Regions:
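Sequence/structural signature of beta-propeller domains
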Residues: 83, 120-450
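C-terminal edge beta-strand
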Residues: 111-123
């Protein structure tokens, strides 16, 4: 018996010695909050970094062991891939809503550690396989191509510019905020942008805020200079101009108040009304690097149901930004967009334009949206390419670039502003969500030629 006891004691001591040679395993998440969508393709992932002293990280096991709301996603809906110290977690959502997922690492000796991943799933949308979600902000309002499959996206609730990979859903690769350079303490309400060479021109809405109050920062146009392309894109601040609204009002007054700009900018005037004042499109005229087309969401012309969309050419736009010269204007252009207004306008090197058309109103996003093509000639009418879907969250706000519209099957990527959308079914507007990782705008590819 004594020998038996001694033998058992020796085994016990040996086991303790072996256990003591390994530390407690650890894991960290690249983000504690993650957003996905039902039926989505290329949804965002979270990287899990694991370690255990005395052990090869590749020998550790990572699993998801619990979901707090299995109607949204079960543990079987979570995939963990990768080897070594970094693993990737992807969730395939079952339904709209929130769930907390328990991520566990198991060490080679059976010791464990856990972290909680807070997951939010938005509902399925049309064109799901052609949709991607740009996270970090829900209020996308303008976009320009950065080359190499990337785009720079502006936000009308902040002054942050974000660089995204257009092919996948996820967080921005890089961000910039030039508020201090511009001298802006509030949002500029960026609504339009266009690129000429290495210069990107950005414009605020130029209108009052939603309460009809004048906010000086919204009366801002500025430039950034681009270096690099794709994931290596970098931006530097250029110059700003803060009197374009004033120039437009003075020009309209001098021409008989044809468009009612003075009344549209008056104290108390709501900008997103049929007779309001709100800029949302910016692009250069065909073959020009000096004359810019400023596209209006409001007013329509005339300011009645069925009125035409308004473009005012700024004939010295380059000089306005480069030297602060007061803006001069050409003959205004009125386009028949079926009673809709301009929400974005973009052209390619062949002077083929796409116009995102939508309501002047600040209604919900069930109002009609359409995509038109145009050749930039004021004498020529735009042609409707397609009606855009309106049953999903978000309003169509931007088109990244324009493909060759003479080629069959050409596709364009459009982006929604989801700031007012209830993405997760709990009554919270996306702009008010407590975590930036849950905020997102949707980018969808549409075929625009037959």
């Amino acid at each position: 018996m004594i020998g038996g006891v001694l033998t058992l004691t020796a085994v016990s001591l040996g086991s303790q010695a072996q256990a003591a040679s390994y530390g407690t395993p650890s894991l960290s998440l690249s983000a504690a909050y993650l957003s996905g969508a039902v039926g989505a393709t290329a949804d965002p992932a979270v990287n899990v970094t694991v370690a255990q002293s005395g052990a090869d990280a590749g020998a550790l096991t990572v699993t998801v062991t619990k979901s707090s709301k299995t109607a949204v996603a079960t543990t079987a809906d979570v995939s963990v891939t990768g080897t070594g110290a970094t693993r990737k977690v992807v969730v395939a959502a079952r339904a709209q809503g929130y769930t907390d997922l328990t991520v566990k690492v198991t060490g080679v000796d059976g010791q464990t550690a856990t972290k909680t991943l807070h997951y939010a799933a938005s509902a399925a949308v049309q064109y799901a396989s052609d949709s991607r979600y740009f996270t970090g902000s829900s209020d996308a309002s303008a976009a320009v191509d950065a080359g190499g499959g990337y785009t720079i996206v502006a936000d009308d609730e902040s002054n942050v510019l974000r660089l995204y990979d257009r092919s996948v859903s996820g967080a921005p690769v890089r961000t910039w905020d030039f508020s201090s350079n511009i001298g802006a303490s509030k949002e500029i309400d960026i609504e339009g942008a266009t690129r000429v060479g290495d210069t990107i021109y950005w414009t605020g809405s130029l209108g009052n805020n939603k309460d009809g109050e004048y906010k000086a920062d919204r009366n801002t146009v500025f430039t950034t200079t681009v270096t690099g392309s794709g994931a290596s894109t970098a931006l530097a601040y250029g110059r700003s101009y803060k009197k374009l609204r004033d120039n437009l009002v003075a020009w309209d007054k001098a021409n008989g108040n044809r468009y009612g700009f003075a009344a549209g900018t008056a104290d108390g005037q709501i900008p997103k009304e049929i007779n309001g004042f709100n800029v949302e499109g910016l692009e250069f005229a065909p073959g020009s690097t000096t004359t810019a087309y400023v596209g209006f969401r409001a007013p329509l012309s005339p300011a009645v149901t069925g009125g035409k969309a308004l473009i005012v050419p700024v004939t010295n736009f380059d000089k306005v930004l480069s030297s602060g010269t007061a803006a001069t204007f050409g003959t205004p252009i009125e386009l028949d967009l079926g009673g809709l207004a301009i929400r974005d306008i973009r052209k390619n090197a062949s002077n083929q334009y796409l116009i995102v058309a939508g309501s002047w109103a600040a209604d919900d996003n069930s109002d009609p949206y359409a995509l038109y093509s145009w050749d930039g000639d004021p004498a020529h009418a735009p042609v409707k390419r397609l009606d855009l879907p309106t049953s999903d969250p978000g309003g169509w706000e931007a088109v990244v670039d324009v493909p060759d519209l003479t080629v069959s099957g050409a596709r364009a990527q459009l982006i929604t502003d989801d700031g007012s959308a209830d993405l997760y079914g709990d009554g919270t507007e996306a702009k008010d969500l407590t975590h930036d990782e849950w905020k997102k705008s949707r980018a969808t590819w549409f075929t625009v030629t037959n």
